[in-house]
């Protein structure tokens, strides 16, 4: 987590430096070296994962107000009084990690973490915080309040999962009979009106003809996702053979999705263990019988989830990194 600290007095600056020694980040003092509150907040809101104001909560609230957009994208914001007595998360408590950060800051300086989110106050399951710690994306953040609202009202919440989850489900959660009857679903392939948590574990293996455009790859990817009902958000990286490392279309396609793409030699791909879909033509061109499946599995270090899919000169396969969700996670 990239932290940025802003203090307003000498006392606050000393505390900010103390916190930064334990939780590294940039430290600035308002009014010093040309630092203005508005400019600092605007820059750090975009560049940092967490903003820590060492001063009054009112100042922080007014400073961040023009920049707040969405609980899925806003950074964590924590306010610490300059005497180090209280650490108060005021933005992105769960998805942004502000609640956890406030607890950590409190442990460093001896403050009291002031956590005001309802689920934490009542000691019940916080689905968005759990999702963050399980490396899952919340597809429909507007549905978080529906799940939390049921739990707060003492009503049952029914969940569906395609993936085994270690431990016993938290109080108030019960397995659903079918995905369509779930309030909450942990899956790579969302259906129905549940709040869907999508594990960020997928690696997309790519094969393509020379000169394939980014637009052609995008169309093929849409068809691949539609074929399997796959949430595109599960993909976090891409992989292919080194013969494709200078393909403009492939590079642009991956960049547009924010995926790092790694390239492997034919020898590396051949040595990847597993059962793969062979192609004599691919073998003759690349020196290995399959590119997309082997590249995905090699890069993921896990298992093949969806095998080779061909569309207009493009081949895709999906492999998943090891993933072990656990109900037993809870705040320290």
Language model: regions and residue ranges:
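Conserved mixed alpha/beta catalytic, RNA-binding, or beta-rich assembly cores of soluble enzyme
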Residues: 12-18, 34-36, 44-99, 104-108, ...
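Short, structured coil segments at secondary-structure junctions
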Residues: 23, 109, 256-257
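C-terminal non-catalytic interaction/assembly regions of soluble proteins
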Residues: 237, 241-296, 300-304, 310-314
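Class I S-adenosyl-L-methionine
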Residues: 2-15, 24-65, 252, 268-286, ...
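Terminal alpha-helical anchor/extension segments at protein ends
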Residues: 199-204, 220, 288-332
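N-terminal basic/disordered segments at the start of proteins
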Residues: 1-29, 307, 312, 319, ...
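Short, basic, helix/turn surface patches
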Residues: 107-108, 140-148, 286-299
């Amino acid at each position: 987590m990239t932290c940025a600290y802003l203090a307003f007095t000498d006392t606050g600056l000393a505390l900010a430096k103390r916190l930064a020694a334990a939780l590294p980040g940039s430290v600035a003092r308002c009014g010093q070296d040309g630092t203005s509150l508005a400019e600092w907040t605007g820059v750090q809101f975009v560049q940092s994962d967490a903003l820590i104001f060492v001063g009054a909560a009112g100042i922080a609230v007014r400073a961040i107000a023009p920049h707040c957009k969405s609980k899925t994208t806003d950074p964590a914001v924590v306010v610490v009084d300059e005497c180090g007595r209280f650490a108060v998360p005021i933005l992105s408590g769960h998805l942004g990690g502000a609640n956890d950060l406030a607890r950590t800051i409190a442990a460093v300086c001896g403050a009291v973490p002031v956590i005001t989110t309802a689920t934490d106050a009542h000691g019940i399951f916080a689905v968005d915080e759990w999702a963050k710690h399980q490396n899952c994306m919340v597809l429909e953040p507007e549905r978080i309040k529906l799940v939390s609202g049921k739990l707060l009202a003492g009503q049952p919440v029914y969940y569906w999962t395609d993936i085994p989850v270690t431990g016993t489900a938290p109080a108030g959660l019960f397995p659903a009979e079918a995905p369509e009857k779930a309030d909450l679903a942990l899956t790579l392939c969302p259906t129905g009106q549940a709040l869907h948590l999508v594990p960020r574990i997928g690696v997309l293996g790519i094969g393509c003809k020379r000169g394939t455009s980014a637009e052609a790859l995008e169309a093929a990817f849409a068809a691949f996702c539609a074929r399997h009902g796959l949430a595109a958000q599960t993909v976090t990286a891409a992989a292919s053979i080194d013969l494709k490392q200078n393909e403009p279309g492939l590079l642009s396609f991956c960049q547009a999705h924010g995926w790092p793409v790694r390239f492997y030699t034919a020898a590396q791909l051949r040595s990847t263990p597993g059962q793969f879909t062979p192609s004599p033509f691919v073998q003759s061109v690349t020196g290995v019988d399959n590119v997309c499946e082997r590249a995905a599995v090699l890069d993921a270090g896990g298992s093949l989830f969806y095998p080779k899919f061909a569309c207009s000169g493009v081949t895709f396969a999906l492999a998943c990194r090891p993933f072990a969700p656990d109900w037993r996670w809870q705040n320290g």
